[in-house]
């Protein structure tokens, strides 16, 4: 058989072999490529026969060899695409998803106990005609201290260790600045001011079971004509009874806050022993729950409110303390660790 006939036979056999490799036969395809086009392949061996051809026939057969090489190279490339597509399809078929199977269930989250406490308190005050006012966590020293009757170098500032950002900018130590800003804007010709300001506050405390560098407060303020200590006591009694039960009683003890005068600490009768004395109330029958008092005249005057005509009361309570008392939580750090198992207890 002459060289030209052998070349045609190689072309025909290679085409037939390629047709057999329609599935995932990448290994077989590579072996066939090496056998036909490799350095020791069939086409290379046939090329060696060119030297035995006449001078007239050698260029003709040489051209035929080059054309065959190009043809077979393209044929192998096209078949490689077919084999790769078959390989991908086989993988897809083996890894197909049954859409009728139930999906993976997401773990259910729970509303944080502090969120629940805050919303409960807010609902109580909304029902009493109060408005809810939000404020800035990053506050000016002027509003955080001076407007609360705490001028620079006032000794009472030592009561609150503060995170200062600059000399005049700080992380608020209470939500009272919201009250000062609201007093500045309120139009008393339209009626008294009744507001609460919930939010997060910051103190330079060392974190332990009962202290945290951040915690939550809800402070309340009522300012109008003829507001008295009796109004304060009545408001606090209503709040305590709604939160801890109708049988709860309160008592007021004299205290000191720079922004109220007179100032009181508010105790609630122990909800564990009913006032008989236990480990929760330290055998006293009473639990300290919040601080309050009549708004200091200086605080009113700094907002342009006539302290001779208007009076008011203010109070502040902590959501963490209420939650710890209500649910017997003995470590405040649990509120901030982001553990869903903790929140699940209070769903």
Curated annotation (Swiss-Prot):
InterPro entries referenced in this protein's UniProt entry, alphabetically: aa-tRNA-synth_II (IPR006195), aa-tRNA-synth_II/BPL/LPL (IPR045864), Phe-tRNA-synth_IIc_asu (IPR004529), Phe-tRNA_ligase_II_N (IPR004188), Phe_tRNA_ligase_alpha1_bac (IPR022911), Phenylalanyl-tRNA_Synthase (IPR002319), tRNA-bd_arm (IPR010978)
GO MF entry, a single one: ATP binding
Name of one Pfam family that matches: Phe_tRNA-synt_N
Annotated compartments: Cytoplasm
Positions with a binding annotation for Mg(2+): 261
Enzyme's top EC category: ligase
Cofactor(s) named in the record: Mg(2+)
This protein's record includes keyword ATP-binding: yes
Reactions catalysed: tRNA(Phe) + L-phenylalanine + ATP = L-phenylalanyl-tRNA(Phe) + AMP + diphosphate + H(+)
Record keywords: Aminoacyl-tRNA synthetase, ATP-binding, Cytoplasm, Ligase, Magnesium, Metal-binding, Nucleotide-binding, Protein biosynthesis
Similarity remark: Belongs to the class-II aminoacyl-tRNA synthetase family. Phe-tRNA synthetase alpha subunit type 1 subfamily.
Protein name from the UniProt record: Phenylalanine--tRNA ligase alpha subunit
Predominant location category: cytoplasm
